[in-house]
From Swiss-Prot:
Organism for this UniProt entry: Buthus occitanus tunetanus
Cysteines engaged in disulfide bonds, as pairs: 38-61, 47-66, 51-68
Entry protein name: Lipolysis-activating peptide 1-alpha chain
Superkingdom in the source lineage: Eukaryota
Quaternary state and interactors: Monomer (edited version) and heterodimer (non-edited version) of this alpha chain and a beta chain (AC P84809).
Function: The heterodimer non-edited LVP1 induces lipolysis in rat adipocytes. Induction of lipolysis by LVP1 appears to be mediated through the beta-2 adrenergic receptor pathway (ADRB2). Intracerebroventricular injection is not toxic to mice.
Claim: Transcription is one of the keywords in the record: no
Alphabetized PROSITE patterns for the sequence: LCN_CSAB
Gene3D superfamilies: Knottin, scorpion toxin-like
Length: 91
């Protein structure tokens, strides 16, 4: 009986772990529709700068392209991000 209870607890814990998602994000796109490629993997100023342009505070180089944490789908394109975050009414 004790083994069955322990097994049930383990199954519940693994199901909870599976439902926890990591921090979402996206690869931002440049004005030509391509990725911003990078060579220094991990944190670097280039990717942080690119992510700030897209309206996100933090990003890093992952799989040779800049990855921005918490970047929403509608802000992936640089033009959509600029229109959303810029105060210029002519955009």
């Amino acid at each position: 009986m004790m083994k069955l209870v322990l097994f049930g607890i383990i199954v519940i814990l693994f199901s909870l772990i599976g439902s926890i998602h990591g921090i979402s994000g996206n690869y931002p796109l440049n004005p030509y529709g391509g990725y911003y490629y990078c060579t220094i993997l991990g944190e670097n100023e280039y990717c942080k700068k690119i992510c700030r342009i897209h309206g996100v505070r933090y990003g890093y180089c992952y799989d040779s392209a800049c990855w921005c944490e918490t970047l929403k789908d509608e802000d992936v394109s640089v033009w959509n991000a600029v229109k959303k975050h810029c105060k210029n009414p002519y955009l």
